[in-house]
Structures are given as C-alpha cells and as structure tokens.
C-alpha cells in the first residue's frame, strides 16, 4: 500500500485533456480568420480533446512569430462550461489591435489581463506590462479540481512562456487593483506604471476571470441565453428574471454568436463596488460615468481607458 501511494505521488494523473494539432501554416492558409494584416505570423489550429469524448471540447488558434513563444489568439468552447479559456471574438481583437497601433503612442505601456496583453503585444506591437503566459485563473470544471496541478503543468509546457517571480507578483498587484474600490484601484495601477503614459484594456470576460481569483470581492455568475431573430433587446425580460430570482444586482452581456448571448451577473458585496465593475457596461450604468480614468475607445466587448498620470 505504501508503495502504491509513493507511485501516485511520483506519477500524478496527467492533465484531463490534450491539445491536438489539426492544421498549421501561414496566415493565408486561414483566410477566414481575417489576419491578412499580419502576414508574418504562423497559425496553428488545435482541438482540445478528452479521451472519453468523441468530439473536441474546444478549438484554439495560436500564433507564433519567428522563434517567439506562441500566443493564444482565439478560443471556442464546445461545451456549456468554460474549459481552458473563455470564448472570444477574433474580429473584435484584430479591430482592437489596429486601433491601439494607430492611436496609442509607441512609448506608452498597455495594461490588460495577461492573455489580452500578449495578444496586444503580438498584433499591435506595443509594450505591455505582462508578457508571459501566467495561466491564471485555471479555468476548469469542478469535476477536474483534483487535477489542477497537472493542468497547470501541461499548460506551462504547451505555451512555453512561464513568468518570472517578479511578473507573477506584479500580476497579483494588478488583480488587486481591479478588485479594489475605484480611487484606490487607480492609485495602485499608477504605482505599477510609474511616470509612463499608460492605457488599460478590459474585456467583459475579465469579469469571470477576476471573479475566480477574487471571489470575496467580486460575486458573479454567468448564464447563456438563446438569441431569437438576432433580437438582443427581446432577451431583457428573461435575463432580468434570472437575475432577480438568483439575487444578483446587475448584468452585462457578451455576444457569443448569432444564436447565443452570455450574461454575466454581479452581486454587490458589503465592500462596495470595484474599479473593474465600474469599467464594464452594466445595464444600469455605463463606463462613460466613470471619472477616475478616461474612456478613450470601445469596440465590442473591449474598453480602453487612459490612466491619469501621477
């Protein structure tokens, strides 16, 4: 029996999924992705597979330039619960990157969640506070919680861009800033960038990621709703009813496809509203009302703010 436990300790269960390369090549091979403006990239399409499931549970597109580590460009979950990453729109991302390349000065620094930071650095050629694959939070169904360590190890090996201890600490500080009260959060962001001109990019899906890392500050949930005849406004009664029945205070929407919308619900805690919650377009308030940072651009689920200088 002791020998068996020793074996399990030295040979832990592997990650419950694997990345399977389906297709790889230059941008021209993936003309439907809309990446013509980045001809120097090599694109890889991967299916995320589980041995016991016939179909992939997700599809990922990653990009590389030269010998640099790969960057996740797009993720499509094929099951109801997010796995690995959250669904995103590549067309929104490329439009965002084009706007940043055009309007954000070369000498400025961009702050964003680490995955968006790597995308901005690759597509917009701008300096970002985070450059590594920090891998937080680990997004996995509850029945995989016992294999979080194996998942983290597999992800580090696959993406080949582990962070330094300093960058990991800086990211924790960044997360704390977003989860703080608005004025305190901005002051913390200013400490991170010093005297540099700085811009902050947030996306509605960051609400889910921040809620996983700071649940005591951001009590949230999400639910997908079918979209009929492309009528988003027609969803309002259904979404509001779910919100009321589950005791949430407000919601924000993300378009997943022409047939589905995801609603993110937020419950205000006793600690007050976070800086991040102020930056998102909830139905009862808009980011335009936020005074502590300057809204400079919005496209789809992305919102760009200029952080005031110290």
Give the location of each predicted region.
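Hydrophobic membrane-insertion alpha-helices, especially the h-region
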Residues: 1-9
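Extracytoplasmic
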Residues: 14-310
């Amino acid at each position: 029996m002791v020998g068996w436990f020793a074996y399990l300790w030295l040979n832990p269960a592997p990650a419950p999924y694997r990345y399977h390369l389906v297709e790889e090549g230059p941008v021209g091979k993936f003309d439907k992705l809309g990446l013509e403006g980045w001809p120097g990239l090599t694109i890889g399409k991967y299916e995320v597979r589980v041995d016991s499931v016939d179909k992939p549970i997700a599809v990922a597109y990653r990009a590389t330039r030269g010998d640099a580590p790969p960057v996740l460009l797009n993720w499509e979950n094929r099951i109801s619960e997010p796995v690995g990453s959250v669904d995103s729109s590549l067309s929104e991302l490329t439009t965002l990157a084009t706007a940043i390349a055009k309007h954000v000065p070369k000498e400025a620094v961009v702050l964003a969640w680490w995955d968006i930071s790597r995308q901005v650095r690759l597509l917009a050629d701008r300096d970002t506070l985070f450059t590594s694959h920090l891998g937080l939070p680990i997004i996995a169904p509850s029945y995989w919680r016992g294999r979080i360590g194996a998942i983290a190890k597999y992800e580090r090996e696959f993406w080949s861009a582990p962070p330094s201890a300093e960058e990991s600490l800086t990211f924790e500080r960044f997360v704390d800033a977003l989860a703080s009260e608005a004025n305190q959060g901005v002051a913390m962001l200013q400490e991170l960038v010093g005297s540099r001109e700085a811009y902050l990019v947030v996306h509605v899906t960051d609400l889910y990621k921040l809620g996983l890392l700071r649940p005591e500050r951001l009590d949230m949930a999400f639910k997908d709703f079918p979209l009929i005849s492309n009528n988003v406004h027609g969803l309002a009664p259904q979404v509001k009813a779910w919100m009321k029945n589950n005791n949430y205070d407000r919601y924000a929407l993300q378009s997943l496809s022409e047939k589905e919308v995801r609603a993110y619900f937020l419950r205000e805690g006793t600690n007050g509203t976070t800086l991040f919650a102020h930056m998102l377009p909830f139905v009862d308030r808009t980011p335009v009302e936020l005074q502590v940072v300057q809204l400079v651009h919005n496209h789809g689920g992305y919102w760009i703010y200029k952080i005031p200088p110290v």
